[in-house]
Amino acid sequence: MTHQTHAYHMVNPSPWPLTGALSALLMTSGLAMWFHFNSPSLLLIGLVTNTLTMYQWWRDIVREGTFQGHHTPIVQKGLRYGMILFIISEVFFFAGFFWAFYHSSLAPTPELGGCWPPTGINPLNPLEVPLLNTSVLLASGVSITWAHHSLMEGNRKNMQQALAITILLGIYFTLLQASEYYETSFTISDGVYGSTFFMATGFHGLHVIIGSTFLTVCLLRQFNFHFTSNHHFGFEAAAWYWHFVDVVWLFLYVSIYWWGS
C-alpha cells in the first residue's frame, strides 16, 4: 500500500461483506425452511457461515486498529457515529414491538375478552423473577461503568474484575430468563399476548447474549493489553451497547411485566 499522508483509513479489499451477505441469505432462507419443512440444515449452515464471517471480520478490525495503527482519532470518530446510528436503528426495532404491545393492550378486541391480559392468560408476577432480572441488569450497568472508569485511570486489575462481574451478571440474567420461559403458563402461539411477550423479551434476551459475547471479547483483549486509556473504542462500543440493553429492559419491565399484568 502506498504511503498515506492523511488520517483516514483506506481499507484493503475484503471478502467478508460478501460472505456476510450470503450467510444472512442462508439464515433467513434456512429459518423459513425450518418453520415450514422442519429441516434445520440450511439454517445451521447459515449460522456457521455467519459466525465464521463475524470472527474473521472483527479479527481483521482488531488487527488494523490495535497492531497497524489505522484507527486514528478521525477514524474512531467515524466508528463512534456508526455505533450511535446502529443503536438508534435498534431503538426503532424495539419501538415496533412496543407499538404492537400497546396497540393490542390499550384497546383490546372482543376476541380477547375486551380485557388485558386476555381471558385465559395468567401473566407473570412482576415482583418475582422479573424484578430480580431488573436488579441484575441495573447492577451490571454499575459494574460496566466501574470497568470504564478503571480503564480510564489505567487500573487493569479493577477493569478486568468489573468486566468479569458484568459478564457473569449477563449470564445470570440469561439463565433467569430461560427459567422464566420454562415456567410460563402461556406460549408464543397463545394469541397476541404470547406473541408480543415472547417476541419483545426474546429479542431483548438475544441482545443480552450478544452483549455478553461482546464484553467477553473485550475481556480477552484486555488480558492481551489491547486497550489503553485513550485508545479503547472496542470496549466503549460494548459499554454503549450494554447500557442500551439495560434501558430497553426497564421499558420492557414497566410496560409488559408491570403495567401489562
Swiss-Prot record:
It is found in: Mitochondrion inner membrane. Keywords: Membrane, Mitochondrion, Mitochondrion inner membrane, Translocase, Transmembrane, Transmembrane helix. InterPro entries: Cyt_c/ubiquinol_Oxase_su3, Cyt_c_oxase_su3_dom, Cyt_c_oxidase-like_su3, Cyt_c_oxidase_su3-like_sf, Cyt_c_oxidase_su3_a-hlx. GO terms for cellular component: mitochondrial inner membrane; respiratory chain complex IV. One of its GO terms (biological process) is respiratory chain complex IV assembly. It is an enzyme of class 7 (translocase). Its EC number is 7.1.1.9. The keyword Membrane applies. The chain crosses the membrane at residues 16-34, 41-66, 73-105, 129-152, 156-183, 191-223, 233-256. It is a multi-pass membrane protein. Residues 35-40, 106-128, 184-190, 257-261 are mitochondrial intermembrane. Component of the cytochrome c oxidase, the last enzyme in the mitochondrial electron transport chain which drives oxidative phosphorylation. The respiratory chain contains 3 multisubunit complexes succinate dehydrogenase (complex II, CII), ubiquinol-cytochrome c oxidoreductase (cytochrome b-c1 complex, complex III, CIII) and cytochrome c oxidase (complex IV, CIV), that cooperate to transfer electrons derived from NADH and succinate to molecular oxygen, creating an electrochemical gradient over the inner membrane that drives transmembrane transport and the ATP synthase. Component of the cytochrome c oxidase (complex IV, CIV), a multisubunit enzyme composed of 14 subunits. The complex is composed of a catalytic core of 3 subunits MT-CO1, MT-CO2 and MT-CO3, encoded in the mitochondrial DNA, and 11 supernumerary subunits COX4I, COX5A, COX5B, COX6A, COX6B, COX6C, COX7A, COX7B, COX7C, COX8 and NDUFA4, which are encoded in the nuclear genome. Belongs to the cytochrome c oxidase subunit 3 family. This is Cytochrome c oxidase subunit 3.
